[in-house]
Amino acid sequence: MARIAGVDIPREKRIVISLTYVYGIGTSTAKKIVEEANVSADTRVKDLTDDELGRIREVVDSYKVEGDLRREQNLNIKRLMEISSYRGIRHRRGLPVRGQKTKNNARTRKGPVKTVANKKK
């Protein structure tokens, strides 16, 4: 397995597909990276030369991926919570951030249903 940005990418797949195993690289970014590195998109990872892998690593290093990207996202969310913006408050309370309704659904953010006992007659 070849290592790119600290991630073992699969050898049997095409390089464009293998690059998407790195956090922060999707299909369109992977195509741009391969194009910048002057490598054929149809090449399998096992068929790449060391020179081609080196060029791909150099291009990937110019992108923010893996730990750096995760750290930046966490810092952005913490900043929103510290300045007590509306989005930060929603993050703090574990509610949907982007304006979704919460009367019925939003179970992914709110967690399992907490049933409330009915008042007896």
Curated annotation (Swiss-Prot):
Signal peptide extent: none
GO MF terms held by the record: rRNA binding; structural constituent of ribosome; tRNA binding
InterPro entries xref list: Rbsml_uS13_C, Ribosomal_uS13, Ribosomal_uS13-like_H2TH, Ribosomal_uS13_bac-type, Ribosomal_uS13_CS
Pfam families linked: Ribosomal_S13 (PF00416)
Span list, region Disordered: 91-121
GO biological process entries: translation
GO cellular component terms given for this protein: cytosol; small ribosomal subunit
This protein's UniProt keywords: Ribonucleoprotein, Ribosomal protein, RNA-binding, rRNA-binding, tRNA-binding
Gene3D superfamilies: 1.10.8.50, 30s ribosomal protein s13, domain 2 (4.10.910.10)
Keyword Ribosomal protein part of the UniProt annotation: yes
Domain of life according to the entry: Bacteria
Keyword RNA-binding: yes
Assembly mode: Part of the 30S ribosomal subunit. Forms a loose heterodimer with protein S19. Forms two bridges to the 50S subunit in the 70S ribosome.
Role played: Located at the top of the head of the 30S subunit, it contacts several helices of the 16S rRNA. In the 70S ribosome it contacts the 23S rRNA (bridge B1a) and protein L5 of the 50S subunit (bridge B1b), connecting the 2 subunits; these bridges are implicated in subunit movement. Contacts the tRNAs in the A and P-sites.
Family, per entry: Belongs to the universal ribosomal protein uS13 family.
Protein name as it appears in the record: Small ribosomal subunit protein uS13
